[in-house]
Amino acid sequence: MTSTRSLLLASCVFLLAGCGVDDHGMILVVDHSYVPAVTVTTSDGITTPDGILWWHGKLIMADEGGRALRVWNHGPDVVTLCDRSLGILEPEDLVVDGEGNLFFTDDTAGGLWEVDRNGHAFVVAGRSKGLFSTEGIALAPSGDILVGDGVRHEVFSVTRDGRVSQFLDANRGITKPESMVYGENGNLYIADNHDDVLYRLTPAKKLERVLENREGFSPETIWFANHVLYITDSKHGKLSRYTPEDGLETMVAFAGKLHDVCGVTTDDQGQLYVSIQDNESDRGYVVKIGHDAAKDVIPLAAQHD
């Protein structure tokens, strides 16, 4: 069943400390080349999505609260790829290879999981291989899957047949490799939302602290597209962009029930999508941040089933 989405315009100067936010939440677009629109809600068949990924015209979602992987294809409902019957508990982040094989992590069940291009779902390497609480994930140039573990404070490399080896050990200082993505020139970006640090790992495995000790900054999910690193911050309710030339810039701020912004991805046209969790109400949203007419503040009104 679809829901009626009502977006009301408001005039307000947004402050992170509060702005007369209503019970339903508010979105402030700082970059006026974008405007938000609610795309998917709990009424469409999701619970509380975390990681999201745009692939071949479809939005793939790690539905953390629903213990499932789901796909939205512009229709009224979503399709479930796999669920808790497989053994997954809280799917976290995901990546897809060039052949359409989907890999994802689970910070509660642990392990690296796969839904292959034929729709067969299985665990590639589980807790028995030392993957206790898997978070960030990235597809390495070698074809192996890099997986961050928040309990062991390490990053592992996993082959397609489930062989696990150490990629970055705990001595490198990353406490919680929450999200990972490759940027330009073979650099791997790693978000640590425990220590509030954005790292960059060069091809020579030199680990650099790109952003740290910044008030109001805690990287949740990172995504690289069009020479820009996009960063969500669920702790402070922000979507930002980073380039070496311009530094860190806030694009969108979220408040109220829309505060906890999680995943981020881009479609083929460069439109942004973010996932939002309202865990108090056990509801979730996917919001498109698209290139349309500029709007300042858009509070989300009631969601009518």
What are these regions (language model features)?
Residues 36-43, 78-84, 120-127, 164-170, ...:
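A short beta-strand motif characteristic of beta-propeller blades
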Residues 61-65, 102-108, 147-151, 190-194, ...:
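Conserved beta-strand positions in repeat-built beta-propeller and related beta-rich domains
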Residues 43-56, 85-99, 128-144, 171-185, ...:
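Beta-rich, blade/repeat-based domains predominating
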